[in-house]
Amino acid sequence: MASGRKTKNTWVLVVVGLIVVGLAAGLEAMRPLANPLTVAIRSLALMGYQLVFLSIVSSAYILELVRFFGRPFVKVHHIASVTGLALVTLHPILVAVDKGSAGVFLPKFDSLRVFLQLGGRPAWYLIALAVLAALLRQRIGSRWRWVHILNYLAFALATAHANLLGTNFQDLAPRVVSWAMLFAVLAVFVRKRLPKPKPAQKPGAS
C-alpha cells in the first residue's frame, strides 16, 4: 500500500548538492592551475569527503529529517552515503591512472605518520564496508550497526589524510573547517551512544 506522505522540501537537497560542488570548486580555484586529471582527483575527494560527513551527521537527526523531507530517512541518508562512496572510489581510481599503479589502493604501515598520511586508503575500505552493511541491514540484522560504526573511523582517517597530504588543505581555513567537521562527527558518535532520556510521565499515570 502506498504511503500517503507527500515528499517535500526536495529543493533543499538540490541546494546542498550545489553547495558541495561549489565548495570543492572554490577550494580548487584557490590553487595554481593544474591539468584536468589532477583537478578531477582533488575535486572528487573534496565532494566525497563532504558527503560522507553529511551522511554521518544526518544519522543523528532521523526524526527531524523524516518530518522535513516527508520521506523515509533511509532514502535521504543513502543518497549521501552511496554518492559519497562513489566519489571517494573515483578519487583513488583516477590517482591510480595518474600514477600508473594500483598500489594506491594498498594501505602502508611504514610508520604512524605514513599510515595517517595515506589514511584515505584504509578509509575507502571502511566506508565501503559501512555502506554495504547498511544496504544489507535486513539480511544481517542488528549487526549492521556495528559495521556501520566504521564510518566514524574512516572519516577520522580521511581527515588526517587530507591535512597531511591534500593540496587543497594547505591553507589554515580548510584545515580548521576539516577538524571542526571531525569534532562534529565525534560529537554525533558520542550523542548516539548516550542513554536516551525517558519521556516524562503524565500526572496520575500509574
Predicted feature descriptions by range:
Residues 1-206:
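Membrane-embedded alpha-helical bundles that constitute the cytochrome b-like, heme-associated redox core
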